[in-house]
Amino acid sequence: MRRFLLLYATQRGQAKAIAEEISEQAVSHGFSADLHCISESEKYDLKTETGPLVMVVSTTGTGDPPDTARKFVKEIHNKTLPTDYFAHLRYGLLGLGDSEYTYFCNGGKVIDKRLQELGAQRFYDTGHADDCVGLELVVEPWIDGLWAALTKHFKSLGGQENMSDTLSRASDAPLSTAMKPELLHIQSQVELLRLEDVGERDSELREQNETNRGQQGRIEDFDSSLVHSVPPLSQSSLSIPAVPPEYLEVHLQESLGQEENQASVPSGDPSFQVPISKAIRLTTNDAVKSTLLLELDISKIEFSHQPGDSFNVTCPNSDREVEELLQRLQLADKRAHRVILKIKTDTKKKGAALPAHVPEGRSLQFILTWCLEIRAVPKKAFLRALAEHTSSATEKRRLQELCSKQGAADYNRFIRDASVCLLDLLLTFPSCQPPLSLLLEHLPKLQPRPYSCASSSLRHPDKLHFVFNIVEFPPSTTAASPRKGVCTGWLATLVAPFLQPNTDVSNADSGDTLAPEIRISPRATNAFHLPEDPSAPIIMVGPGTGVAPFVGFLQHREKLQEQHPDGKFGAMWLFFGCRHKDRDYLFREELRHFLKTGVLTHLKVSFSRDAAPDGEEAPAKYVQDNLQRHSQQVARTLLQENGYIYVCGDAKNMAKDVNDTLIGIISNEAGVDKLEAMKTLATLKQEKRYLQDIWS
């Protein structure tokens, strides 16, 4: 068979699943995929690779390559590498991203760009799949086209076609080869800012997204639902994926009664069990969202951190949802049985391996509670597998529709956008009775949840604060009862017995109630820290819980000023926003204290739901409105005083709006056009003077 090297760079398993799908399909097209995680550098060597390379690369954080690709990215960015280092290499790359974030698909773009700079050439156009509208809209046609591109590549090696023809489509690389080397990175950053009037590829993406939304809109005109389709889909012949090969053999053994706890959860990072020493409600009871602050006692562990860092919290699934799942799977009487896994001897799955996130010999209840993401939105391959275990012909057909090419719009509307999970499907399709092995094959690892540090170790030695909203999901057509966020709901229940009402954080007492413990682990360090030069002015933009790291910044700066009374410290601006002044103004007293003492130079607060008193000017509704009102000072800080700007909070709307506002401010105040303003902002990002800590 014709061999190609297939590498994936994954953060949460999405890229791995797609790469495995490519590997499975390869055989039927006459190819053999040599599949590896990009971090397994001992198993491949791109410098001597003779076969074509196919890569699937995800994006994490604010446009970073995934953790598994960090070493690879660092190595290929070695400045001593010659420009023909990869001249022998022919590749195709599929990037995964989310257009709700500013730096869409940047993980893939960084690698794609560097491979080009080192002489590699594409045998197949790069794909950019958007999780905002559905990865499969790009992933499926990209995989379909891959086989023809590979066939053409191998034919060209045999002299049947001219290599230049094979590679002609690679000539549309986004960066001009005539561009000066020092401008390459800036130009790349500008491209990734994704303004609507710049970039041919982005316009194509938007057209594709609009087409998809149009498909969904047409469906809404009919009485379709998760369980029911309408013409033309209900009458169409379906193109559905092949049934994923089963590969796990599961045995349930009666337990000997061993004790199980969080420490049994597999983790690649060092983790620590720490007590919660304080819990405070920061919002009033009538606030739209409930926001809590938790204080952790880290005095017994080595856990160094600084303001701007984040850390992971290991959390379980909801007890109620686990119980419902056990009942629905008819396994409630075996909840305490130990789960023993083996690879099926006759499996057709290439490279089948036991899931690393399922510990050996743990109880079924423990695995469903601590190891599997039972809230995960099922991928189409999972739906296809579930259809094979559905006895009702009507229900089976509907599951097949939802995983078919023809049913892509229905999948987006009723599965992905509705955040439907396995339990929802099993309750909606009562004749579906999958074996436990299928769940263990398809449910991903229950991921720890990241939180920003909201305190300084200088102000609170041996303590660690973090802040979160209790995420709540109202009842829906698939979930009859309301649900809370997996981690935030669990934490809220955990601290309910000793939760203190809205109060000044610094004056809150540690309760006498026995403190529950949670497991935390450090995350990779980032650049979201105070400047090394304390005299540099900074602008902080953080509405809602996005203010958390900035409270840590201010605590840290206050202590530094106390320790160095003659030191020179730059101005600190904080743009904060909330809904109501009297309900969810987080850290109000502490922020006023910082303003009074001069640690905080300017505090600009916007209230999106409060009306202006009679006769007064309407207040700014959002943080970007306040930025615009102070555009001269913002521009002077960034462009003349070498200042820094930090943005923390929601990626979907706020971060984009702030980014657009900054471009407008630079354009107006510096008297340059939009493109030049984008270049300036890209330079700030490259210099790590424009930093983001955002989430969706």
UniProtKB/Swiss-Prot annotation:
FMN binds at residues 10-14, 93-124. Residues 166-245 are annotated as: Hinge. InterPro entries: CysJ-like_FAD-binding (IPR003097), FAD-bd_FR_type (IPR017927), Flavdoxin-like (IPR001094), Flavodoxin/NO_synth (IPR008254), Flavoprot_Pyr_Nucl_cyt_Rdtase (IPR001709), Flavoprotein-like_sf (IPR029039), FNR_nucleotide-bd (IPR039261), NADPH_Cyt_P450_Rdtase_alpha (IPR023173). Disruption phenotype: Female mice have more resorptions and more delayed embryos per litter as well as embryonic delays and defects: placentae of mothers are smaller and their embryos are smaller and display myocardial hypoplasia and a higher incidence of ventricular septal defects per litter. Epigenetic transmission of developmental disorders between generations: a hypomorphic mutation disrupts folate metabolism and is associated with effects on offspring development that are transmitted transgenerationally. It is found in: Cytoplasm. Residues 269-531 form the FAD-binding FR-type domain. GO terms for cellular component: cytosol. It catalyses: 2 methylcob(III)alamin-[methionine synthase] + 2 S-adenosyl-L-homocysteine + NADP(+) + H(+) = 2 cob(II)alamin-[methionine synthase] + 2 S-adenosyl-L-methionine + NADPH; 2 cob(II)alamin + A + 2 H2O + 2 H(+) = 2 aquacob(III)alamin + AH2. The modification Phosphoserine is found at S171, S188. Pfam families: FAD_binding_1, Flavodoxin_1, NAD_binding_1. FAD binds at R449, P450, Y451, S452, G485, V486, C487, T488, W695. Keywords: Amino-acid biosynthesis, Cytoplasm, FAD, Flavoprotein, FMN, Methionine biosynthesis, NADP, Oxidoreductase, Phosphoprotein, S-adenosyl-L-methionine. Residues 4-147 form the Flavodoxin-like domain. Its cofactor is FAD; FMN. Its EC number is 1.16.1.8. GO terms for biological process: cobalamin metabolic process; folic acid metabolic process; homocysteine metabolic process; methionine biosynthetic process; protein stabilization; S-adenosylmethionine cycle. Forms a multiprotein complex with MMACHC, MMADHC and MTR. It is debated whether the reduction of free aquacob(II)alamin occurs spontaneously or is enzyme catalyzed. PANTHER family: METHIONINE SYNTHASE REDUCTASE (PTHR19384:SF84), NITRIC OXIDE SYNTHASE-RELATED (PTHR19384). This is Methionine synthase reductase. It comes from Mus musculus.
